[in-house]
Amino acid sequence: MKTKTLFIFSAILTLSIFAPNETFAQTAGNLIEPKIINAETAQFSTKKLRKVDQMIERDIAAGFPGAVLVVVKDGRIIKKAAYGYSKKYEGSELLRRPAKMKTRTMFDLASNTKMYATNFALQRLVSQGKLDVYEKVSAYLPGFKDQPGDLIKGKDKIRVIDVLQHQSGLPSSFYFYTPEKAGKYYSQERDKTIEYLTKIPLDYQTGTKHVYSDIGYMLLGCIVEKLTGKPLDVYTEQELYKPLRLKHTLYNPLQKGFKPKQFAATERMGNTRDGVIQFPNIRTNTLQGEVHDEKAFYSMDGVSGHAGLFSNADDMAILLQVMLNKGSYRNISLFDQKTADLFTAPSATDPTFALGWRRNGSKSMEWMFGPHASENAYGHTGWTGTVTIIDPAYNLGIALLTNKKHTPVIDPEENPNVFEGDQFPTGSYGSVITAIYEAME
């Protein structure tokens, strides 16, 4: 398999971070002019980086669909590569001529939306003094309160920080889009879903454990909309991505001039898990350029705090650099260093959780970070096959974007959520991340 690999790229500016925002604008330099560099310039072994290629290429040869990898070190993209195919299937049938993956291919980020849309927005609002993470959720969403018949009470005590740390008591998910499962909260209308979100009952007492929650991040997206008076997609695109000059990071891209062929395909047969799932209005075509997540697509019109964002390697490199710069890029300050530190600090009860971000807080996170990341590394994953790693100790950022769900479901009747692509090392992330760290000298 021929791999499109570039070890030399346009430089990304590594900026010093100044705590006062007004000082930053006066002292920051312009973007460094593009330079031709090799991996050794950034203290990487070209030979060992080739092992990363070989690892992914082996998976491609064995049936893994495709991937794009970008690595940022010391303010420069030192590796960007495309592997395999952006689309191999049309429905259940293999294409005679699968579409090759390109480094500019755009991906459904799935739950990385939580970080690079919702968290970025929240971090900006906190930095501007418009949001207090220690304030009650109900202060921003008055409808967020206990309902008659709720077995577990206490929504009036839940703070924004509890939701960010995934210890609010909210359930992991909810099937709004399926009438049999949602009952009175069935909704395939965005406004109605937002109303119902505040009424979903708690699953456990706040603060007693960490349960990763899409519902929590859907609510956080609603808080952004309430505070800004703008839909989440409009706010993030105007206030975050436009100042950064990002052209390929957005919600609902097919409604904004992009074509399906520009995207990595996800599930082969819509949301049917190879034909075993049914609900009203379910998609059955191969998904390409539409958000895969059911709650986001059917119940939130493609725009939600937990899923829906698309991006590509070049844009992700800049977003990684913003975090490495603790909020700034070029002469733009999205949020200040104090806010960046607040959001990436470990939870007192579980060091693998920060405010939204996942941290390399214990060996339990080795599947994502590998064994060599620093204890202060943080990042996130997305169900469709995306992982991002930010390691301040090494001034290192990694985005591995895959379309691992663009493969058959292994056993639809037994478990409709396990795809062939999940079983490959590339789709499990940790081995690729480990090889990248081992290439550093």
From Swiss-Prot:
Pathway(s) of this molecule: Cell wall biogenesis; peptidoglycan recycling
Pfam family, one: Beta-lactamase
UniProt keywords, alphabetically: Cell wall biogenesis/degradation, Hydrolase, Signal
Keyword Metal-binding included in the entry's annotation: no
Record field: catalytic activity: Hydrolyzes the link between N-acetylmuramoyl residues and L-amino acid residues in certain cell-wall glycopeptides
GO biological process: one example: peptidoglycan turnover
Signal peptide positions on this chain: 1-25
Gene Ontology terms for molecular function: N-acetylmuramoyl-L-alanine amidase activity
The protein's name in its UniProt record: N-acetylmuramyl-L-alanine amidase
Originating species: Bacillus subtilis (strain 168)
